[in-house]
Design a protein with these regions (language model features):
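Intrinsically disordered, low-complexity, positively biased terminal segments
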Residues: 1-5, 12-17, 37, 50, ...
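Basic, Lys/Arg-rich alpha-helical nucleic-acid-recognition elements, primarily the DNA-binding modules
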Residues: 10-11, 21-86, 94
């Protein structure tokens, strides 16, 4: 039998689309434009492993700055699992993020393995599933994010994330067929949210808000952009009981969970104002 060498390289965008297809096959239901948006966050932060000429493994290790990175897309094609290829690309990814506090959202089946690499549990994120439609709220303070100065949106996003993600946020709020809305309190941005098309339905994320009232208004505004026949998904930090209650109020059901884990200290973020996580893949 041919002895094929295993090689790891930085992905190009075409290869990131391959990893997105693997994520779809794993049941992770990525957004239709996720690969293009994620790539903007750190073009060097996506690794792919080839066995000969065949791509068989992936990992994303987005380095937002010199102190914080996010790990995701850790996938080995099923027929090649248990042969050490995953560990090789895992180690290459962590080497790229050396010196960073590294975060991930780990599926239940892998959480014990992540602990062996010094990841520590911070809290659970819960994916809720519901349906679109409903009346748009009567709110004169709603704004379209792409019409605001991008610096204003990035400044608000940065309060909820351990690092600035300028290129990513710009791509995220301008991706095709999404709706990116905010709420202004006077001249100040007080909430932001995005709903984007996925292979199945739509995902809301992020949903950040200064108050529960703003979060609910923005949730309803985003939900109303989608047909009542479409599924919608919202990924909620379980520690935010008000966010959980919002999902339950609108008859959303629990469909999936992850563990948010960090190698370093848990960042001091306003989780009580995080009503929806941006993405399980890159934070």
């Amino acid at each position: 039998m041919e002895n094929r060498a295993f090689k790891i390289k930085v992905m190009d965008l075409t290869e990131l689309e391959i990893a997105a297809k693997w994520a779809l096959q794993e049941g992770w239901n990525p957004g239709l434009s996720d690969a293009q948006c994620y790539y903007q966050a750190d073009p060097n932060g996506f690794l792919i492993g080839y066995l000969g000429d065949e791509p068989i493994a992936s990992i994303s290790v987005v380095k937002y700055d010199d102190s914080f990175g996010f790990l995701g897309f850790y996938i080995v094609k099923p027929e090649y699992r248990g042969q050490g290829y995953g560990m090789q690309i895992w180690q290459a990814g962590l080497q790229y993020l050396a010196g960073c506090n590294v975060a991930l959202d780990g599926v239940v089946a892998q959480q014990e393995n992540y602990k062996k690499s010094d990841f520590k549990l911070a809290y659970r994120n819960i994916r809720y599933e519901g349906v679109g439609g409903g009346e748009a709220p009567d709110c004169s303070n709603l704004v379209v994010l792409e019409r605001l100065p991008i610096e204003e949106v990035i400044a608000y996003d940065s309060a909820f994330f351990p690092a600035k993600r300028v290129a990513f946020v710009n791509a995220w709020i301008n991706q095709p067929d999404c709706y990116a809305l905010g709420i202004k309190q006077g001249d100040i941005l007080a909430a932001i949210g995005v709903i984007r098309p996925c292979h199945v339905g739509y995902k809301i994320g992020p949903l950040y808000a200064d108050s529960a009232e703003h979060a609910e208004t923005l949730f309803l505004a985003l939900r109303s952009k989608v047909s009542a026949t479409e599924a919608i998904y919202l990924d909620v930090p379980e520690v935010n009981a008000v966010a959980v209650a919002l999902a339950q109020k609108y008859k959303m059901s629990l469909s999936f969970e992850t563990a948010r884990m960090y190698t370093g200290e848990r960042p001091d973020l306003p989780l009580m104002q995080v009503f929806g996580v941006t993405s399980f893949e890159i934070g």
